A protein has these predicted regions:
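Aromatic-lined, polymer-binding surfaces characteristic
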Residues: 292, 296-306, 314-366, 375, ...
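Short, compositionally biased P/S/T/A/G/V-rich stretches that sit at domain boundaries
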Residues: 21-33
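Bacterial Sec-dependent N-terminal signal peptides
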Residues: 1-23
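Active-site-adjacent structural elements in folded domains
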Residues: 278-283, 338-346, 381-386, 433-441, ...
Length: 585
């Protein structure tokens, strides 16, 4: 027996060495866009082994010289695929240049520090918005969905034609929702209003290359506004969506969309304030407020912006804002979307936030304060889960618009609502190295971008920087400081690790890029394992970084994590504009 043991010992030792070598695999995750000289600069070290590291180095990429050696700080423990993690904080280093980090045998990709690292990123994401246009599509240089659409649920006879061509396709399908489109339009308008110097004019209003004296972001916002006008053509008419989940029967280019048995016409659903079809069930619509409130807010902001650009359009926007406000009051409650084949819908459950947003932008201070008090904190903040788009638009835009018009104690009180929500997230986030406490539900990246905006707004309104590291961590997550080490935006940065095989017809059928599209992002392993119709078409290059906690695939077959969305991208446009503007101050 002893003889056999000694014969096996070298093999056993070799096996132990192999195990150690495998479990000691480690990576450093960074924001691939880079960092600003005076901003928070943190990378995350993640290891398959359990040993902590004492320090890390910042190294000049050109000379190989160590310019900074810092303590790796306390070990943060296991997270997702990693057994040990550290936050590598190099915020004190401010010299512009190109660098990499080294910690043990782990080495980060190159990254830049500079005031200009975010320049042009917001405009880059507008490429995806233009590509999502319905009607004339400038990317295709062709038209689609010119026969929208025939009515359902309206006061007019079913199948009445209404001209509603325009707007944006919601995602890689070609559905068009008023709720997401109004929210996207509002974000683009606010981005122009708050950071006008960030945006360039290199495209015409129709989305083709050229210029027209108008910033491209405002051209894109107006594309959304003009469609919202079609969806609210009369004071007592408002439509909720074009098309439904019959769209999901297969990928195709937009102009070949004929899924509804009526040639190229698509259904247009009227907002009734009553439940409508949801697969074999009915949705939980209770009123008209959530979608109409978003319309009112977008129109009101547009009225202010266009006052010195196009007076007639400004007056039209002001009138429509009031009209949408009144429509929202017809039956206080939430408007959910409709589906025919499956139960998957945008199951929005809150509406007072939308009414606060509408009231604040319409300068209805007392109404806005009343609605704000009814839902001071967006309900998902600090929670582990939520239904798909249950608390939309993920943060309360109304608090920001209201705080901008208030003073004194009223202003402090509204700002405290943001503080409370951020604190709920922070109490969970500070337990892991990624400062991650966003639920891994569908469109987790959209929640991430929105939460980063809330942190930014809180900092701007107060000057309080206590949550700056949390804000930056959520921003960094979207560009590679995550377990997978990938940016979640197609093509950004240009030479980075970004999605290349998204769930999108343009890339899958046409082999065309979808520059600037923010993909849905990781989901809980439990969600991924229970979704219908997911099948990976290629080996998983991120297999070492998958876990039961969260899954992400850069694979056409994974519609749950790798499908870009129009509204998430519009939110990201605002966030990127904010970061570029802040870096240049």
């Amino acid at each position: 027996m002893k003889k056999i043991y000694w014969q096996l010992l070298p093999l056993l030792l070799f096996s132990v060495q192999l195990i150690a070598r495998n479990t000691d695999s480690a990576w450093i995750r960074i924001n691939q866009l880079g960092y600003t000289p005076n901003g928070v600069k943190v990378a995350v070290y993640g290891s398959k082994g359990s040993m902590s590291i004492p320090q890390f180095s910042l190294i000049d990429s050109a000379t190989g010289k160590k310019l900074l050696v810092r303590s790796a700080g306390k070990a943060m423990g296991a997270y997702g695929p990693f057994n040990q993690t550290h936050r590598l904080d190099f915020s004190s280093f401010t010299k512009p240049g190109t660098y990499y980090l080294q910690a043990g045998k782990a080495r980060s990709p190159y990254f830049r520090i500079g005031k200009d690292v975010y320049n042009g990123a917001a405009d880059f994401c507008l490429r995806y918005m233009r590509q999502q246009r319905s009607g004339f599509n400038p990317f295709l240089k062709d038209s689609c969905h010119m026969y929208d659409g025939y009515t359902l649920y309206g006061p007019m006879p079913d199948s009445t034609f209404v001209p509603v061509t325009g707007g944006w396709h919601d995602a890689s399908d070609y559905l068009q929702y008023s709720t997401t489109s109004a929210n996207a339009t509002a974000h683009l308008l606010m981005a122009y209003r708050d950071f006008p110097s960030v945006f360039k004019d290199t495209y015409a209003a129709n989305g083709l290359p050229g210029n027209n004296g108008i910033a491209d972001v405002l051209d894109e916002a107006k594309w959304g506004l003009d469609w919202l006008l079609k969806m609210h053509p009369k004071d007592d008419w408002m439509f909720n969506q074009i098309a439904d989940d019959r769209d999901h029967s297969g990928m195709r280019i937009p102009k070949l969309d004929s899924q509804y048995g009526r040639g190229y016409e698509r259904p247009v659903y009227f907002i009734t304030g009553e439940p409508q079809v949801r697969g074999r069930f009915m949705n939980n619509t209770t009123g008209t407020s959530s979608t109409a409130g978003k319309f009112a807010g977008a129109f009101a902001i547009a009225s202010g912006i266009y006052r010195n650009i196009d007076k007639d359009y400004s007056e039209l926007m002001q009138y429509k804002a009031g009209s949408a406000w009144r429509f929202a009051l017809r039956k206080p409650g939430v408007t959910q979307t409709a589906s025919v084949k499956s139960p998957y819908i945008y199951a929005e459950d809150n509406w007072v936030d939308d009414m606060e947003f509408a009231a604040a932008t319409l300068q209805r201070k007392e109404d806005a304060l009343r609605y704000a008090a009814q839902e001071p904190v967006t309900p998902w903040l600090g929670e582990d889960t939520a239904k798909h788009y249950q608390w939309y638009p993920f943060i309360n835009l109304g608090h920001y618009e209201l705080a901008r018009m208030l003073k004194g104690e009223e202003k402090k009180n509204v700002i405290s609502y943001y503080h409370t929500g951020i604190r709920k997230v922070w109490e969970k986030a500070n337990r892991n190295a990624f400062y991650r406490a966003i639920p891994y539900i569908w469109c987790s990246n959209n929640l991430t971008a929105s939460f980063a905006i809330q942190c930014y707004w809180y900092r701007q309104l107060t000057g309080d920087k206590q949550f700056s590291a949390l804000e930056q961590a959520n921003f960094d997550w979207l560009f590679g400081c995550n377990p997978w080490g990938t940016s979640m935006v197609y093509g950004l940065p240009v030479h980075g690790d970004t999605p290349v095989d998204p769930h999108a017809a343009f890339t899958h059928i046409m082999k065309a890029p979808i520059d600037g599209g923010l993909v849905d992002g990781p989901v809980y392993g439990s969600i991924y394992n229970n979704l219908i119709g997911i099948q990976l078409f290629n080996p998983d290059q991120y297999a070492p970084f998958q876990s039961q906690l969260a899954v992400y695939h850069d694979d056409y077959g994974d519609y749950s994590t790798n499908e870009p969305t129009m509204d998430g991208t519009a939110s990201l446009v605002y966030l990127l504009a904010a970061f570029q503007w802040s870096a240049g101050k």
